Amino acid sequence: QRVMIAMATVCRPRLMIADEPTTALDVTVQAQVLKLLKHINQKYGMTIVLISHDLSVISQICDRVVVMYAGRIAEAAPTQVIMTAPAHEYTKGLINSLPSMERKGSDLPCIPGHVPSTEEKREPCPFAPRCALADDICRQQEPPRRMI
């Protein structure tokens, strides 16, 4: 990972896209990679688009988060807002399923249902079939975008 990051930064681009840069790394190496990315961002002013399914990694390094579900933006906000006051039920489910010391030894909550395949017909809100708060409006029209 570090070699790839070095190769990606040698020409000092203004943007780096890091797709799952910490996947399959042990926590020590993961911390080193995150520290390196943070250093590159701060020293060179390089924008880093971090693509990850790991919210604990995202919360350590990102200023803003865009949560996607079934190819659509579910929510976008500053990281602190996403982590402390998520607005979308999918984001809430992701955060609730993070391991924590308070729940040590207990099963992690999971989001019921399944992620739709690309062939499945989707509701205007693709999360509606899995959402406990979904009502008719969720199945009839796409939720409006609003600033958070």
Residues covered by each model-derived region:
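P-loop NTP-binding/switch modules centered on Walker-like glycine-rich loops
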Residues: 12-21, 25-107
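ABC nucleotide-binding domain signature
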Residues: 4, 47-49, 124-126, 130
